[in-house]
Amino acid sequence: MSLYPKAMDELIKNLSNLPTIGRKSARRLAYRIIDMDPKKVDELVESIVNVKTNIRPCANCGNLTDKKLCDICSDQKRDNSVITVVEDSMNVISIEKTGEYNGKYHVLGGLLSPRDNIAPQDLNLENLFLRCKKDYVKEVILALSPTTNGDLTTNFIIEVLKNEEYNVKVSRIAMGVPLGANLEYYDEMSLYKAILDRREIK
């Protein structure tokens, strides 16, 4: 026998499917939603549907946007010669918060993971390598988290870009941050320093 009405049990189950949300947190959220004004609930549902309907990866870099090209790719004042490679759009936000980076980005949409069967073709890698062949791209900064999968992905990209057909400098952000940490949890100063102190690999 369930402790909750069927509709509430379904809500708790669906909320607990979200990353970092356990069943206990999902239960709290469910009770909060029940107590919310119906109009606010409708607005929440509309926002979720709107995001799923209108938000998509940028056709150029993979960052999330509601247009064909994201605002960063469309900004003519940004430095086209430098591309920083990150795992996801949350990492873009983290770097942008430093207020010190003026280049472009490339969002992979994940990391290589043999354990989870995530292979190169499952990530936004092909478009990265196409961008790196363009004459105006001079440097690729690898800003992936210092985790096992992050290192695996970084090393894969380095090996590909070592090929003579790619005339770009490749560098990696300094590792003055805890191993295993995700970039989104770095404070702005640490992240800025990590980019500033990046080391050249190729």
Curated annotation (Swiss-Prot):
It holds the Pfam family RecR_ZnF. A zinc finger (C4-type) spans 58-73. GO terms for biological process: DNA recombination; DNA repair. GO terms for molecular function: DNA binding; zinc ion binding. It comes from Finegoldia magna (strain ATCC 29328 / DSM 20472 / WAL 2508) (Peptostreptococcus magnus). May play a role in DNA repair. It seems to be involved in an RecBC-independent recombinational process of DNA repair. It may act with RecF and RecO. Belongs to the RecR family. Keywords: DNA damage, DNA recombination, DNA repair, Metal-binding, Zinc, Zinc-finger. This is Recombination protein RecR. Residues 81-178 form the Toprim domain. PANTHER family: RECOMBINATION PROTEIN RECR. InterPro entries: DNA_Rcmb_RecR (IPR000093), Rcmb_RecR (IPR023627), Rcmb_RecR_Znf (IPR015967), TOPRIM_dom (IPR006171), TOPRIM_RecR (IPR034137). Transmembrane segments: none annotated.
